[in-house]
């Protein structure tokens, strides 16, 4: 069963932790294992004492020596089994410690209930919004409780999983004891054994061989902590099965929080990635320890998690081999040449909980990275001073980044392989071309004339957008895909090439516009046949009014109105926090980043490179264009989301 605590409110998580049996069963299990270990130690000592007494006493000769040799294996078996039992007791106590830590970190259910009761009381009396500040404070505290419970449960899940990976069944423990091998050597050979035993042994061998399978760990993107069965099926069919035939795909929980994009009060990106990396690494090691190979699927945030885990595993004392582990990543923010985290290396926004991590390692494990052209997360312009290109990428985060699972197998098979890598690499890079610019999608939504107008300007606009990537013919950087490439100032493109592309674009745009206009499909006028009948006596008869029903309706309307006002107020003030955090980042981190870039340019100039002075001025400007455009886009998404929520709340009370 997948853990789903990240999407559960504190009422559920707190109740689960405090209402359970607690640590008593594990303490009892630890005591039982200790008793078993003590009995096994006593049995080993007693058996050893008896056999040694016989040898030292009156039993001498070759038979005595043979007995001592045979008994030694049993004594070793008993002693080693006792040690295993002691280890199991220690692990049970470790599980108790993990649970007690989680219990201490979990909010008590009484505190959660008190918070909800206070909110309900304030909402009931909030007819004119006078309780909005108090409700906001309580809601903020409630969200802190939510985050605290999720963090506690995530820590418990990771700790308990780590303990579970060290546990083995008692039968496995017995089979791993060295003395057991010598005992097995005394069993009859297959020629001497009954045919039924031989068949059973052969079946066991075949089963063990079949157990060496490839397990696919499928993670969701931001806002999808638990991938659905359909999500896992598509990830396998579209991306995984082509490179790893026969993979057994299964969902893997990771928190996937992204404040304030997913939910305004939610886990930050950095916290979510850190927890997800621990969970993924534990799951990989657990599968490899079970004798399975592993292939990992990561999308968006989980591609960042995969990138971190690659480096962590490769640097560990016991790294998996490339034959045991592989990765498939889509919409990767850490794409070496195009990922938004790689375009702005090292930048961090503490108020938003977002830090740009390094590029995905390209020569540690077999990896495939798929990127849709103009995806602003995985295919950010190399030259963001081109405002049109940057704005198109921001639109791409909304219109393109979510399209990876609606592609057809034919589109993925037609992806362009980027083969101009540098040096040895285990990673294959693919670009999936996009027909239309995301920037023009709002225009295309205009009825009748939207598509013709968009097709009129798109060819020339695409030339301008593509210049932000370095080549007017491509909406992605054509430099080596496995080299971490930060943003730059100006592309090295001949003006003649640009002029030729614009001339060709003008001709294409006029031709496309003329074709669209000549094939317009105008809506048909209504014939009136669907108009409702207004004839006398038609329709459902209206029930007679009564005083009781009228009062009941007024009470319901009053309650609905109060609840709606409260919800609208809560949504409105909830947008203030992310707005303040975005402003905080814009007023503190962005200027600091500009100074850092300026000093880098000055340092470059002092070392004799005259371009350093240009970079000292140009790099901060380019960064500002990208970062302030992204901040504006993020704020717009927050406002749109809040507006939709408010509209839905209001429409609920309007008949």
Swiss-Prot record:
Gene: PPE28
The name this protein goes by in its record: Uncharacterized PPE family protein PPE28
Record-level GO BP terms: response to host immune response
Organism name: Mycobacterium tuberculosis (strain CDC 1551 / Oshkosh)
InterPro entries reported for this sequence: AB_hydrolase_fold, PE-PPE_C, PPE_dom, PPE_sf
Domain of life: Bacteria
Family, as annotated: Belongs to the mycobacterial PPE family.
Transmembrane regions: none
Record domain PE-PPE: where: 245-469
One of the Pfam families matching this protein, by short name: PPE
């Amino acid at each position: 069963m997948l853990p789903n605590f990240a999407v559960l409110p504190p009422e559920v998580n707190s109740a689960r932790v405090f209402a359970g049996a607690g640590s008593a069963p594990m303490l009892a299990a630890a005591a039982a294992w200790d008793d078993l270990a003590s009995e096994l130690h006593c049995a080993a000592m007693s058996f050893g004492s008896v056999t040694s007494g016989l040898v030292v006493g009156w039993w001498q000769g070759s038979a005595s020596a043979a007995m001592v040799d045979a008994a030694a294996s049993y004594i070793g078996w008993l002693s080693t089994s006792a040690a295993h039992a002691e280890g199991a007791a220690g692990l049970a106590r470790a599980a108790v410690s993990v649970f007690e830590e989680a219990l201490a970190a979990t909010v008590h259910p009484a505190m959660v209930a008190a918070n909800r009761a206070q909110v309900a009381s304030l909402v009931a009396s909030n007819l004119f919004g006078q309780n909005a500040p108090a409700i906001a404070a309580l809601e903020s505290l409630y969200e802190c409780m939510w985050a605290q419970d999720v963090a506690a449960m995530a820590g418990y899940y990771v700790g308990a999983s780590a303990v579970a990976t060290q546990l083995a069944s008692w039968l496995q423990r017995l089979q791993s004891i060295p003395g057991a091998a010598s005992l097995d050597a005394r069993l009859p050979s297959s020629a001497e054994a009954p045919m039924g035993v031989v068949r059973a042994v052969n079946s066991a061998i075949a089963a063990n061989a079949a157990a060496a399978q490839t397990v696919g760990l499928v993670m969701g993107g931001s806002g999808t902590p638990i991938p659905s069965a359909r999500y896992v099926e598509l990830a396998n069919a579209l991306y995984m099965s082509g490179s790893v035939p026969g993979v057994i795909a299964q969902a893997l929980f990771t928190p996937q929080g992204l404040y304030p994009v997913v939910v305004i009060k939610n886990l930050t990106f950095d916290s979510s990635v850190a927890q997800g990396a621990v969970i993924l690494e534990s799951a990989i090691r657990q599968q490899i320890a079970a004798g399975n190979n592993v292939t990992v699927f990561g999308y968006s945030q989980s591609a960042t998690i995969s990138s971190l885990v690659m480096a962590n595993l490769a640097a560990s004392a016991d790294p998996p081999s490339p034959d045991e582990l592989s990765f498939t990543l889509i919409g990767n923010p850490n794409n070496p040449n195009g990922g938004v985290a790689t375009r702005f290396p090292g930048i961090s926004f503490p108020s938003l909980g977002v830090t740009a991590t390094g590029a995905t390692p390209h020569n540690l494990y077999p990896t495939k990275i798929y990127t849709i052209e103009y995806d602003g997360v995985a295919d950010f312009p190399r030259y963001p001073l081109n405002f049109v290109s940057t704005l198109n990428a921001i639109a791409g985060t909304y219109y393109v980044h979510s399209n990876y699972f609606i592609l057809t197998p034919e589109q993925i098979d037609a992806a362009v392989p980027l083969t101009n890598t540098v040096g040895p690499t285990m990673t294959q890079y693919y670009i999936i071309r996009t027909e239309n610019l995301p920037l023009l999608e709002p225009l295309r939504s205009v009825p009748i004339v939207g598509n013709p107008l968009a097709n009129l300007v798109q060819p020339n606009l695409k030339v301008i957008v593509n210049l932000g990537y370095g080549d007017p013919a491509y909406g992605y950087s054509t430099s080596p895909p496995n080299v971490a490439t930060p943003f730059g100032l100006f592309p090295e493109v001949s003006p003649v090439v640009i002029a030729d592309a614009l001339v060709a674009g003008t001709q294409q745009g006029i031709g496309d516009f003329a074709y669209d206009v000549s094939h317009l499909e105008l809506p048909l006028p209504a014939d009136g046949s669907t108009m409702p009948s207004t004839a006398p006596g038609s329709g459902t008869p209206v029930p007679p009014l009564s005083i009781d029903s009228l009062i009941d309706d007024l009470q319901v309307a009053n309650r609905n109105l109060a609840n709606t006002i409260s919800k609208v107020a809560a949504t409105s003030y909830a947008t203030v926090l992310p707005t303040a955090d975005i402003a905080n980042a814009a007023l503190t981190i962005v200027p600091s980043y500009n100074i850092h870039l300026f000093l880098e340019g000055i340092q470059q100039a002092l070392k004799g490179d005259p371009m350093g002075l240009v970079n000292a001025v140009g790099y901060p400007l380019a960064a500002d264009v990208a970062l302030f455009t992204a901040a504006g886009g993020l704020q717009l998404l927050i406002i749109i989301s809040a507006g939709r929520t408010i509209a839905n709340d209001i429409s609920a009370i309007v008949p």
